[in-house]
Amino acid sequence: MPGLKVVSPWNIEDCRGLLKASIRDNDPVVFLENEMMYGIEFDVDPKIMDKEFLIPIGKAKIERPGTDVTITAHAKMVGHSL
């Protein structure tokens, strides 16, 4: 399907920012929600409470910067890979 986007949030910040971006996107978006993440606590940055907080779709997020290796993961595996 042309234009289809798939997002897979890792934490509450990703969920809030990507869900708002998905709703505002003109193309279809599949939002993968992992039920195994329910009940897991995350630190909350006050910036996510801003009404205009978005995470742009299509931009990778660097959870821990480094110079030796690149590990890619999504959803619950982000926590395991860190």
Segments predicted by a language model, with ranges:
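Conserved thiamine diphosphate
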Residues: 1-25
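Short beta-strand segments
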Residues: 8-10, 32-34, 72
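Glycine-/acidic-rich phosphate or pyrophosphate-binding loops and their flanking alpha/beta elements
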Residues: 17-28, 37-82
